[in-house]
């Protein structure tokens, strides 16, 4: 009897230590996405799946290298928030742009899943569906919702990566150009590399009528490279954030109150008042 008891205690202890070790690896991988990076964004529509007579695929989208500061604005055991800030131009002309934000939450059960037309449906996950997983919550430049997904970080063969597929609104590069689809089904891969990190995408451009009827118009691939550089390359972005972070703290807190209601969200394109 005692032997079984000690075996049980050993297995429980081993499981706990293993879980804590995995959590530390996950956290270290996420924190490696912070810093100053030289970034390039590259997208290409690869396969046309529709038979629409007047269909016009998107042109390839490639950017020149820009600096992007990814700064941790919250960091605890189960929640890491990273604000991205673009720094474009040189001493003759420089522009600072508050870019996207990503929150990583461990074993999160509350998701907002994008439906279409600026509508997100609240979803409460079962524990078996989020145990050991991290939710990546991605926000627009104004901290409004964009897309969310829950998956496990994987550490194998010297690689650390996280993969997930989730619906999202049209990207900014297409929002003003394309009206023939209304959902981008994003398959994201975030992988930590020896040069920084890589954001790969295999996306589907979807014309969604309702929860049952939809058409996949085309496939798209994306290759976004974040190459780590010296921190002083992003000094203007950091200065801008130090001057403006309190204002954005207020904005985030207002949005946090809305998200905490755990209800479906619908955003208006215009506000009259």
Language-model region placement:
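Low-complexity, serine/threonine/proline-enriched polar segments
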Residues: 74-77, 81-155
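Hydrophobic h-region of N-terminal signal peptides that target proteins for export
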Residues: 10-19
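Acidic, serine/threonine-rich low-complexity disordered tracts
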Residues: 182-189, 194-273
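Short helix-loop boundary/capping segments
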Residues: 127-185, 205-207
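Hydrophobic/aromatic beta-strand elements that line small-molecule binding cavities or substrate pockets
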Residues: 57-74, 83, 99-103, 185-192, ...
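Positively charged n-region of N-terminal signal peptides that target proteins for export
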Residues: 1-6
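N-terminal helix-cap/turn-to-beta initiation motif at the start of protein domains
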Residues: 21-36
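Short, solvent-exposed loop/hinge segments that bridge or flank secondary-structure elements
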Residues: 22-26, 42-77
């Amino acid at each position: 009897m005692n032997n079984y008891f000690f075996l049980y205690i050993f297995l429980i202890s081993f499981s706990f230590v293993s879980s804590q070790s995995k959590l530390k690896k996950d956290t270290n991988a996420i924190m490696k996405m912070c810093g100053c990076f030289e970034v390039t964004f590259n997208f290409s529509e690869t396969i046309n799946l529709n038979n629409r007579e007047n269909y016009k695929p998107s042109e390839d989208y490639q950017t020149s290298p820009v600096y992007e500061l990814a700064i941790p604005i919250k960091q605890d055991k189960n929640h890491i928030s990273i604000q991205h800030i673009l720094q474009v131009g040189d001493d003759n002309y420089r522009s600072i742009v508050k870019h996207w934000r990503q929150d990583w939450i461990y074993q999160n059960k509350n998701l907002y899943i994008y439906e279409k037309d600026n509508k997100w449906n609240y979803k409460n996950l079962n524990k078996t569906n989020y145990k050991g997983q991290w939710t990546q919550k991605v926000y627009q430049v104004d901290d409004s919702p964009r897309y969310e997904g829950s998956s496990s970080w994987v550490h194998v063969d010297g690689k650390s990566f996280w993969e997930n597929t989730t619906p999202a609104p049209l990207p900014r590069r297409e929002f003003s150009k394309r009206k023939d689809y209304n959902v981008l089904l994003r398959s994201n891969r975030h992988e930590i590399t020896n040069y920084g990190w890589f954001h790969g995408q295999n996306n589907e451009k979807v014309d969604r009528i309702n929860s049952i009827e939809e058409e996949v118009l085309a496939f798209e691939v994306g290759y976004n490279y974040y190459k780590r550089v010296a921190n002083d390359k992003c000094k203007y972005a950091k200065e801008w954030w130090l001057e403006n972070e309190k204002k954005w703290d207020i904005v985030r807190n207002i949005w946090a109150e809305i998200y905490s209601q755990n209800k479906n969200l619908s955003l208006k394109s215009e506000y009259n008042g």
